[in-house]
From Swiss-Prot:
Name the UniProt record assigns to this protein: Glutamyl-tRNA reductase
Sequence positions that bind substrate: T49, C50, N51, R52, S109, E114, T115, Q116, Q120
Subunit architecture: Homodimer.
Source superkingdom: Bacteria
Amino acid sequence: MHILVVSVNYRTAPVEFREKLTFQAAELERAMTTLQNQKSVLENVIVSTCNRTEIYAVVDQLHTGRYYIKKFLADWFQLEIEEVAPYLTIFEQDGAIDHLFRVTCGLDSMVVGETQILGQIKDSFLEAQQVKATGTIFNELFKQVITLAKRAHSETTIGESAMSVSYAAVELGKKIFGELTDCHVLILGAGKMGELALQNLYGSGARKVTVMNRTLSKAEIMAEKYMGHAKPLSELQCALLEADILISSTGASDYVITKEMMTKVEKMRSGRPLFMVDIAVPRDIDPAIDELEGSFLYDIDDLQGVVEANRAERLKEAEKIQFMIEEEIVLFKTWLSTLGVVPLISALRDKALAIQSETMESLERKIPNLSDRERKVISKHTKSIINQLLKDPILVAKEIAAEEGADEKLALFAKIFDLEMEDVESRAEEVEHKRAWTPSVPSL
């Protein structure tokens, strides 16, 4: 089995392509179920955010797994593989494990050290578990990754100086307008990104705030927290007439603000400029609007320069976290290496217990007058002898499993104890069929 990551992210793909490969939250479970039925895929978790769409998979063959995951992405988004392939980054084995740790800890984020990705990874993992897309390997790996990410943020100061993308959008607005006290601010979208933006705006002095959302009640709840006003999306054109700053993050599949709409609005704004930041992926605002004279449009990729603030300090903390990651990878690989020896140990235990059972039957025939208590005492002590005898061989088998040339050494181990390899292989298949189990996931 092999661990594989297929990634489309902000480093390798511009926002105009990333938005083509973004899974909507409502379709994520169906997507993971579909991917789970692809050839070679044994386990999978799909993570889709504004800056990345990534498929984490356990596959039985690397080459086959790579191909069918690429094909799945192309088919799902109705593209050709040739269109998708140039923007994909693929990580395998140790590189894949390291990438998952780095992403979850915020080291691969546009804003190094941000914590929002940790919650997004956990949510995707839980959804994958619900549709039985994960099994023994990913249940252990993701549990370990989430635990480390929490520890990394509590034991270092990387998160203290990290900006969110929403914060960066507000900082960009402050650079252009200076004080925000007299600015009319319009927030489109009442999700996490929108609320983070509003929180940062309020902290920067903005008080003339309007929140709009497809569900008006959500906009009202969010606006009330920050002394703002809520309006239905049907009044968007009027709201655009009043706004000085617009920050949009609705999660809509089509443009919420089109060039045609904005052309009409500009004619009624009497030359007043409108600063627009689109932090949604797919984008909410038609990029052609940037061609208009009075509209200044920035998308999520334009925020890269803003988030460079405090980067040196955060990178110093990132080095500490990378060291923690490397230690965890060693622990995970040690655990992973012992998976192959489980059927062998199981076969050894069963053979020893079968001998113990036969011995008990022989003893009862020779001493038929044993009481129930005597039988239980003898059975308990003979099993104890077996456990003590097997303790060292089992430890040795686990050590061998982590060494080079483990297959040959374990085959010799099986031969010494006269274990049938067919029986061991059969047990391995049984273990594989029982991959899906649900461990507790660390709370955030």
